[in-house]
Amino acid sequence: MKDFAAIDFETANGKRTSVCSVGIVIVKGGRIVNKIYRLIRPAPNYYTQWTTAIHGLTYDDTMEADDFPEVWAEIKPLLEGLPLVAHNSPFDEGCLRAVHELYGMTYPNYKFYCTCRTSRKVFGKDLPNHQLHTVAERCGYNLENHHHALADAEACAQIALLIIPDPPKPKKAKKADKDTHVGDLFASLIPQQVKKNK
């Protein structure tokens, strides 16, 4: 895949609305053209020990951060026309839908692709697991700061460039032959059985 935006959310607690950071890597023409990292004030605004142990963020880190709507207003125009790619996309898509609903925002129905699901199809049992760092290593990318949203998004982008094919282009509808009459077109739509019963 050559044109997409890789995305990764980290959350402050077990609620999918509690996104506390987002990393986005925009790829066009097979090249990374933009990287975005933002802290977000989570909702609900509290951290659990186990989430902090995963990504290292605390209440103090996001105390003065913007709420999701302000952050997304900056990001949304950059994603126009691009599919989104995530590793374990049901989680990130679930977070994105949840915060849109929480803040009464219209969800744009982003098209998501999943590098984890694709890895299972491409590599299968050749890998011990299909976690992000494992797949990244298999694709020749060294993920040094796992669970930092931007680092994870960049790893996801590098994987997607290698293993997710470009989506098929929609077929163009054939134009009717210039010599075809309207009556002939309607006749072609009449089921054969109906014609026989006339």
Regions found by a protein language model. Give the residues of each.
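Short, glycine/acidic-enriched loop or turn micro-motifs at the edges of active sites
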Residues: T11-N13, R117, A155
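Conserved non-catalytic scaffold segment of RNase H-like nuclease domains
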Residues: M1-N109, K125, N129-H147
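Conserved beta-strand -> loop -> alpha-helix junction used to position metal-binding or nucleic-acid-contacting
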Residues: P108-S119
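Sequence-level motif detector for i,i+2 pairs with an aromatic at +2
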Residues: M1-K2, V33, Y110, T180, ...
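Conserved catalytic/binding loops enriched for acidic/polar residues
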Residues: D152
